[in-house]
């Protein structure tokens, strides 16, 4: 519950500032004008932006009204910042309306390494404690997520080549799992923890992946390469990927996807087909299994593809779409203009 999270954050700040705090849920009556009271509520106020808030103070009553749960979080953060910046004074605004200007605001964390793993190609890094011990540190993640909230960020991007074979099991392809059973259970527990804690804070965990990459056990089972830029789309590969995405969306709350159609695909026509007939249907399958009608964010990386062509084909079937550029070092260290493949 984002309102409860906001209240707990406010309480912690006021405790540290030396105030005696009593938190009460459900009762919105203001009974004692001598006691400083902060009331946190979600309101259906369409004059506020999405994730926006409205703060009013009359006497000892300060109301923080959020357009949604995230709005309550950001309104509460406004009060927290004012307490911290004024040596603990409770100098709250008589009236303030605010909300984010940018729809997605976030930070990227790479689950990749500077060297290849033995037996694997580029971008192929299963989620394991040996490769990424820090990923399993819950205390560190709580601090990081709280930092994102303090900076009004609403998305966390995890960058990896093919994460699904570390995070979900497929009934039709049980052999595709890329980690041992003990590690898989750790990954399930850790990713569930991360996405649930992020959800409390109004943060989408957006998983990035390259295309088309197959899990190593899956590829070996069918005598395929994990990556082959010149390989056409086949029904088998499409089915495996679609079911992987569906299982991921169904299993973990508050996730989105960042899709790179570059590196291991051949033509723009394949990009369009893959995005509209495999990836988006996979997302929709996962949502349908949950009975959800919302659309989580789906980002298309503009690298090595015709972004406009793909987006134009995708928008009729999926609306919550975004694009992004990753500005690579090799593009920034030359004064010569670079083409689309450098982004």
PLM features: what roles do these ranges have?
Residues 6-26:
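N-terminal segment of the mature soluble domain
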Residues 2-4, 72, 165-167, 215-217, ...:
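Extracytoplasmic/secreted cell-surface and envelope-processing proteins
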Residues 22-50:
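Short, well-ordered secondary-structure micro-motifs within conserved domains or adaptor modules
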Residues 23-25, 207, 300:
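A structural preference for short, hydrophobic beta-strand core positions in alpha/beta folds
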Residues 19-27, 88-95, 159, 261, ...:
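Surface-exposed patches in mature extracellular/periplasmic domains of secreted proteins
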Residues 1, 39-44, 65-67, 111, ...:
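Structural motif
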Residues 6-9, 13, 46-52, 56-234, ...:
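Feature activates predominantly on carbohydrate-active enzymes
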Residues 154, 178, 185-188, 192-193, ...:
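Catalytic-core regions of glycoside hydrolase
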């Amino acid at each position: 519950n984002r309102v409860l999270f906001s209240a707990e954050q406010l309480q912690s700040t006021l405790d540290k500032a030396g105030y005696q705090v009593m938190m009460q849920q459900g009762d919105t009556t203001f009974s004692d004008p001598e006691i400083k009271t902060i009331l946190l509520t979600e309101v259906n106020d369409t004059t506020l932006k999405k994730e926006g808030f409205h703060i009013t103070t009359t006497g000892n009553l300060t109301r923080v009204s959020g357009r949604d749960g995230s709005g309550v979080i950001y309104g509460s953060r406004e009060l927290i910042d004012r307490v911290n910046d004024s040596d603990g004074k409770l100098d709250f605004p008589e009236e303030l309306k605010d909300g984010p200007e940018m729809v997605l605001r976030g930070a990227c964390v790479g689950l990749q390494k500077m060297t290849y793993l033995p037996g694997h190609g580029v971008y192929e890094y299963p989620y394991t404690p040996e490769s990424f011990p820090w990923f399993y540190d819950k205390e560190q993640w709580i601090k990081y997520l709280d930092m994102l909230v303090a900076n009004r960020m609403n998305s966390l991007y995890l960058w990896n080549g093919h994460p699904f074979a570390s995070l979900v099991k497929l009934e039709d392809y049980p052999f595709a799992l890329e980690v041992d059973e003990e590690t898989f259970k750790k990954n399930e527990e850790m990713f569930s923890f991360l996405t649930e804690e992020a959800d409390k804070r109004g943060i989408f965990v957006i998983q990035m992946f390259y295309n088309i990459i197959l899990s190593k056990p899956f590829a070996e089972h069918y005598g395929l390469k994990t990556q082959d830029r010149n390989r056409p789309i086949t029904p088998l590969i499409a089915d495996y990927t679609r079911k992987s995405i569906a299982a991921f969306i169904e299993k973990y709350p508050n996730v989105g996807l960042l899709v790179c159609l570059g590196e291991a695909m051949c033509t723009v026509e394949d990009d369009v087909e893959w995005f509209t007939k495999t990836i988006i249907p996979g997302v929709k399958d996962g949502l349908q299994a949950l009975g959800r009608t919302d659309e989580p964010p789906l980002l298309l990386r503009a690298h090595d593809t015709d972004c406009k062509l793909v987006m134009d084909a995708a928008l009729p079937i999926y609306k919550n779409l975004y694009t992004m550029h990753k500005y690579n070092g090799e593009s920034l260290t030359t004064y010569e203009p670079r083409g689309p493949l450098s982004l």
